[in-house]
């Protein structure tokens, strides 16, 4: 089967310089969702018709199995499909999809193609309470499809018809060249409508069959930012429902966003307003507090993530505790039973089993052993303005509060670092290290007071 995806439109109502089909839904371009669905049908040819912003669209969805046809002037859907003809296999049927209709299920498309067969003509239709703005399916007295009439060309009687054309059709490719060449643009838009091919098919003795989707939202398109937002919420609720069915506890299914893939073990719980991006894997019994953002990360079983924690490109072991207000940046690798507390940032660093940094610290470009305690206000000074260096902290080290470790530096096993120490030289294992300072107490000091106005 050939699949042609129409993606050449300007999308004026989006009021954006970005081509309409590249606006994101769940973190990915609208067109990418359509291509993914098309791939599940195993097409022999997959062609995207581009026009407005053609170079941007090509770059965004380029792949070895995707070919592109250029529609230099947007002269209608029939003209768009005509541009793809040289790339199609004439011996296979052609399914036409739209780059701004991202939620159609593969099962719905399969139902349509099965109904049409190899040489038939199939139209995906839907019945709406308010069909205003859509092309109507006109049937004869026996219920057979006669033609499709666009809203602007429909009579008052035809505008009462509730069954509408979604635009998604499957057609015998070997007949398309003749049909498309016969189209006329004698309509209110002055365009070559793909819908007019229906009458040509009927004239050729081909019965036009129809199929309908399971859900009305499968055929909704995007023409404005409002419609994009509506489809985003539909998609996210569908994702949330799938997670609930799989056994995930979600505090409010209307307040979760998955912009990629989220894999969950058993008894995972997710509080409100959490965002998951890229590929995220949550082990059994993971608990996530409200307002967390997790991107491209793996979280081990039994780990608790408290509110407002941000995690990106990190690996977290089992039974860890993160947050609230913790930040794991790319390259952070935490072993089992580690604790990263409030206002602690970890970047490109490894923390061993049971190590803790509970308050107000920065751990960057570091290798931290097991059972290390990092006191509040500890900073690994990893950057000299031009280069970054690593800090090595071996097992069982106690780092006092307000410590600065100036990399490159190594702290040996079992070292105790006193509060307020700056460590700029390697420390042998087992030592107490401190910077000697004299504490002075002065008498006679008068604290300034505010003047009353």
Swiss-Prot record:
This is Bifunctional protein GlmU. It is an enzyme of class 2 (transferase). Binds 1 Mg(2+) ion per subunit. Pfam families: Hexapep (PF00132), NTP_transf_3 (PF12804). Acetyl-CoA binds at residues 376, 382-383, 401, 419. Its EC number is 2.7.7.23, 2.3.1.157. Pathway: Nucleotide-sugar biosynthesis; UDP-N-acetyl-alpha-D-glucosamine biosynthesis; N-acetyl-alpha-D-glucosamine 1-phosphate from alpha-D-glucosamine 6-phosphate (route II): step 2/2; Nucleotide-sugar biosynthesis; UDP-N-acetyl-alpha-D-glucosamine biosynthesis; UDP-N-acetyl-alpha-D-glucosamine from N-acetyl-alpha-D-glucosamine 1-phosphate: step 1/1; Bacterial outer membrane biogenesis; LPS lipid A biosynthesis. Its cofactor is Mg(2+). The active site is at residue 359. UDP-N-acetyl-alpha-D-glucosamine binds at residues 6-9, 20, 71, 76-77, 98-100, 135, 150, 165, 223, 329, 347, 362, 373. Residues 1-225 are annotated as: Pyrophosphorylase. PROSITE patterns: HEXAPEP_TRANSFERASES. The gene is glmU. The keyword Repeat applies.
């Amino acid at each position: 089967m050939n699949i042609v995806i129409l993606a050449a439109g300007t999308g004026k109502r989006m009021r954006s310089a970005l081509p309409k089909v590249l606006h994101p839904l769940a973190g990915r371009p609208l067109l990418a969702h359509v291509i993914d669905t098309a791939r599940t049908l195993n097409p022999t040819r997959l062609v995207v018709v581009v026009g407005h912003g053609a170079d941007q669209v090509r770059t965004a969805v380029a792949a070895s199995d995707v070919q592109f046809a250029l529609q230099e002037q947007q002269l209608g859907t029939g003209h768009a499909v005509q541009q793809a003809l040289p790339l199609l296999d004439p011996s296979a049927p052609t399914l036409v999809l739209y780059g701004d209709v991202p939620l159609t299920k593969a099962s719905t498309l399969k139902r349509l193609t099965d109904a049409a067969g190899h040489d038939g003509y199939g139209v995906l239709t839907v019945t709406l309470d308010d069909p205003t703005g859509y092309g109507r399916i006109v049937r004869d007295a026996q219920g057979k499809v006669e033609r499709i009439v666009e809203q602007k060309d429909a009579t008052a009687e035809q505008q009462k018809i509730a069954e509408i054309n979604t635009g998604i059709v499957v057609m015998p490719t070997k007949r398309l060249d003749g049909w498309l060449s016969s189209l006329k643009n004698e309509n209110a838009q002055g365009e070559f409508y793909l819908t007019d091919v229906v009458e040509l098919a009927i004239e050729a003795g081909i019965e036009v069959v129809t199929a309908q989707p399971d859900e009305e939202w499968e055929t909704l398109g995007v023409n404005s930012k409002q419609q994009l937002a509506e489809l985003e919420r539909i998609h996210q609720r569908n994702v949330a429902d799938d997670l609930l069915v799989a056994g995930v506890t979600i505090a409010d299914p209307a307040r979760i966003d998955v912009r990629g893939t989220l894999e969950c073990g058993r008894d995972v719980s997710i509080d409100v307003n959490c965002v998951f991006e890229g590929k995220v894997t949550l082990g059994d019994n993971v608990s996530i507090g409200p307002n967390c953002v997790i991107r491209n990360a793996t979280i081990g079983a039994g780990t608790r993530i408290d509110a407002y924690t941000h995690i990106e490109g990190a690996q977290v072991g089992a039974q860890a505790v993160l947050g609230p207000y913790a930040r794991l940046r790319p390259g952070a690798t935490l072993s089992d039973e580690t604790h990263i507390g409030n206002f602690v940032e970890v970047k490109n660093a490894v923390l061993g089993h049971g190590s803790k940094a509970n308050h107000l610290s920065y751990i960057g470009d570091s290798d931290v052993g097991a059972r290390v305690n990092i006191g509040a206000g500890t900073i690994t000074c990893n950057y000299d303005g031009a280069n970054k260096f690593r800090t090595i902290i071996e097992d069982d080290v106690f780092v006092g509060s307000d410590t600065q470790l100036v990399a490159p530096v190594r702290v040996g096993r079992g070292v105790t670092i006193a509060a307020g120490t700056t460590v700029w030289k390697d420390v042998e294992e087992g030592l107490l290290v401190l910077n000697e300072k004299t504490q002075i107490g002065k008498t006679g000091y008068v604290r300034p007071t505010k003047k009353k106005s």
